[in-house]
Amino acid sequence: MSYLMLDLLSLDVSEAEAEMLRHPQVGGLILFSRNFSSREQLIALVQQIRQIRPEILIAVDHEGGRVQRFREGFTLIPAMGDILPAAKGDMVIAKRWACELGFLMAIELLACDIDLSFAPVLDLNGISQVIGKRSFSAKPEEVIALAQSFIEGMAEAGMGAVGKHFPGHGSVAADSHIAQPIDEREAEAIFNQDILPFKDLIAMGKLSGIMPAHVIYPKVDPNPAGFSSYWLKQILRKELGFNGVIFSDDLGMKGASIAGDYLGRAQAALDAGCDMILVCNDNPGVMSLLNGFVWPASAPQHPASLLKPNAAQTAIALENASRWENAKQLAEQIQLAQQAKV
């Protein structure tokens, strides 16, 4: 069935974690900085995971900028919000750079047998400090153009894209990791601004997955988007025509606590339309679900396996050493340009 994505405590898989990974409802694993000490160790960890569950979807938040879990042995990817300024506002150059950075981010993960980065961020850069330069821009048309190029670079490496945080996290100050953000704007502002990157990239067929925000938009619906059948079934599926995988954001975040304990949160997310739920940084929470939750009898309509890499494309990309090297130099060039401004 495979509705659950969980995490690990440290640099290898404990016997208790191995038992959890064997559970039929576990279909995904997300890695964090605590699971990484070196590229060699990471490769060994992934091999250990694959021996236990060969088909499991292995993911990471590896957007670039301050959200990059693996650093030593990996290229430091610039923050998405630094691309257009580094190109001095030239969108033609910025799009080319975004494509190469998407390729670079993806190929360095795929080379370690990691399937997926939860990227890119499609939020607009507004008042949210937790988003900030994780966003490509404050303007929807710039987010769309740059994200499209970044996603195309990912695809050229063989990796699918997961857009987040639907329908937009940029206009709330609160951080949903530690608080319950509420976006008090009228529906018109959200539909005419924030939702546009999701809408257009879905129409282009660029998004394999979407992660909704743990944000309440009370002028639209009383529930956080990730627990809202209106947002996920009516808007995302029906009106926008999205047919990829919907991942919940981490159900351990404060913004998810409105739905009660983990059993309540999981039920709310699945009822709303999520295909895979994430529970991070809380092993007892994971165990409560594996032991006490009544999972759906049928498999997800949009299984997370849809996000597995295009192996043939990845094999070709891995042989393109010159593109990889040129992209690394580009990333360093943008980083240096940004440091010179500080």
UniProtKB/Swiss-Prot annotation:
Its EC number is 3.2.1.52. It is found in: Cytoplasm. Gene3D superfamilies: Glycoside hydrolase, family 3, N-terminal domain. Substrate binds at residues 61, 69, 134, 164-165. SUPFAM superfamilies: (Trans)glycosidases. PANTHER family: BETA-HEXOSAMINIDASE, BETA-HEXOSAMINIDASE-RELATED. Belongs to the glycosyl hydrolase 3 family. NagZ subfamily. This is Beta-hexosaminidase.
